[in-house]
């Protein structure tokens, strides 16, 4: 077992709560993208809960709010309303990507609100926004917005998002850790017209964890090691962002970054296979919360 590490964030009772809303995309009668062995809604929820637990365990000064913690349908505008009512400092929406049949791709991407500058980006926005079609009154709730019409997305061309720079910066941090910590294929930071981000009054990102339509990716997204690694990558990005914001606003921060901690000696037996490492992590996570030190051991082996 790895050594226990002190919380990364301030434990001061006087510290003002930093509020982060974690949104597991889709749910209930909306499965999201469907793969050969799984549904997007379940992958999203798995990673969202792991991310939230990491933050709650290591950051006593942070309040975590979920848009859902079980398999239920939440309208898009309600998700943003939850974040706005919580006066959130950050909104992180978690999704899983997909391509049409006979097309494959690998890797993770992070998105912010903006005008889609390519047909591919527009298609991602259309797919994520089409969830409103599950709502019987969507034409009224979304002022006639048609998620499948390119003309509807013109509204994003004239939007002024005052949180754009912060959102893009957080998205860049997430991609940095997906690439360097999780060893994922880095598909970059992109912009598109996502309704759930449009209605959120705080820095907001939408994360696409990988491609459920690619068999190898889908298998990875359904392993405990894979989802834990992805959640940890987002967690590291969150810590960095929070620390930077605290320094910018207060001149200092008590948030500790993982890379600032002393390196621990790797106790993983020589010749340990990825499967063996994954099994160990699964056993740990079923019995006790996975500590940061447990994560270090498998980050370099449980990846695509």
How would you describe each model-predicted region?
Residues 1-7:
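Bacterial N-terminal signal peptides
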Residues 13-145, 160-164, 168-172, 228, ...:
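Catalytic-core regions of hydrolytic enzymes
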Residues 32, 152-253:
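Active-site-adjacent mobile loop/cap segments within catalytic or ligand-binding domains
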Residues 142-150, 206:
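Flexible hinge/switch segments at interdomain interfaces of large molecular machines
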Residues 274-284, 288-292:
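Intrinsically disordered, low-complexity charged/polar segments
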Residues 293-300:
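Conserved small/polar residues in nucleotide/adenosyl-binding loops
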Residues 304:
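Cytosolic catalytic cores of cyclic-nucleotide second-messenger enzymes
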